[in-house]
Amino acid sequence: ALPISLKQVDQDYIRILERTKQQITEFHKNQIDKSWSLYKDNGVIMGQMVRPIERVALYVPGGTAAYPSTVLMNAIPAKLAGVKDLVIITPVKADGKVNPVIVAAAKVSGVDTIYKFGGAQGVAAIANGTETIEKVDKIVGPGNIFVATAKKLSYGVVDIDMVAGPSEIGRASCRER
């Protein structure tokens, strides 16, 4: 069980999370692959077997801001695809707790466990496993340059989604003369 009751978070916010979950689910349910096979007269069997990834970690940046959208947009498709054990790794706030907004999004999304650690060291721990942390099969989610580098270095030990990091936004304008 996750370490928070949804009663600890504003109920209007919970309704927003639930509505967002419905919208994300509606979109992603159309992307679910299914196993199939063809049996030919000559005895040949052709097809595709689709099996979900067993255990996936979702990195959720924590630092100074909360990113519940990262939870929703990664956890809901994973659960729809059949991921059996979905865990979050995220840095804690200064008080040693995970932001309640992140925990609420995790509960709404069906996340199984939240680990209270992050950074490159968190990626290394979840990729390789420790005495107390079971390794995962895949790591997804954005992070800073250190997290992105740790994911890149972990590729091959575990699968990763991509080397995702901070977004850069620029604006260009031209003045006619």
State each model region's role.
Residues 38-104:
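Conserved small-residue-rich beta-alpha loop and adjacent elements
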Residues 100-114:
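Active-site-proximal helix-loop elements at catalytic-domain edges
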Residues 6, 10-24, 49, 64, ...:
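Generic structural signal for well-ordered, non-membrane alpha-helical segments
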Residues 2, 176-177:
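Short, small-residue-biased leader/transition segments that mark boundaries at the very start
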Residues 20-34, 59, 77, 81, ...:
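Mid-sequence acidic-hydrophobic segments that form the walls
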Residues 1-54:
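N-terminal Rossmann-like NAD(P)+-binding subdomain of aldehyde/semialdehyde dehydrogenases
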Residues 110-175:
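Conserved NAD(P)+-binding/catalytic subdomain of aldehyde/semialdehyde dehydrogenases
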